[in-house]
Amino acid sequence: MVGWFAYLWLNPAPAPYRYHLVEEGPVGKFDKLGLEGWPGLTIGKYEVRVDSVDKPIAVAYRATRGDAPPVLLNWENRISEPVGSVDSSLSELTTLATAIAKHVPKEAVVLAWWDISRQVRLLADRDTLFTSHLGLPIIAPSYWRGRIGAIAKYEREFWSAPPSAEESLTFERFVDALASEANQGVAMLQELVGSREAYLVVHVTDLYKLGLLRPERLDMAFKDFPLISNNVHGLAPQVKAWMKNNNYDRYALQSLSEKEVRAYFLREGTNGTTLFAHMLPFVDRTPVELQVVQLVHNHGGYWIYKIPPV
């Protein structure tokens, strides 16, 4: 029996999924992705597979330039619960990157969640506070919680861009800033960038990621709703009813496809509203009302703010 436990300790269960390369090549091979403006990239399409499931549970597109580590460009979950990453729109991302390349000065620094930071650095050629694959939070169904360590190890090996201890600490500080009260959060962001001109990019899906890392500050949930005849406004009664029945205070929407919308619900805690919650377009308030940072651009689920200088 002791020998068996020793074996399990030295040979832990592997990650419950694997990345399977389906297709790889230059941008021209993936003309439907809309990446013509980045001809120097090599694109890889991967299916995320589980041995016991016939179909992939997700599809990922990653990009590389030269010998640099790969960057996740797009993720499509094929099951109801997010796995690995959250669904995103590549067309929104490329439009965002084009706007940043055009309007954000070369000498400025961009702050964003680490995955968006790597995308901005690759597509917009701008300096970002985070450059590594920090891998937080680990997004996995509850029945995989016992294999979080194996998942983290597999992800580090696959993406080949582990962070330094300093960058990991800086990211924790960044997360704390977003989860703080608005004025305190901005002051913390200013400490991170010093005297540099700085811009902050947030996306509605960051609400889910921040809620996983700071649940005591951001009590949230999400639910997908079918979209009929492309009528988003027609969803309002259904979404509001779910919100009321589950005791949430407000919601924000993300378009997943022409047939589905995801609603993110937020419950205000006793600690007050976070800086991040102020930056998102909830139905009862808009980011335009936020005074502590300057809204400079919005496209789809992305919102760009200029952080005031110290």
Language-model segments: what does each one mean?
Residues 14-310:
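Extracytoplasmic
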Residues 1-9:
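Hydrophobic membrane-insertion alpha-helices, especially the h-region
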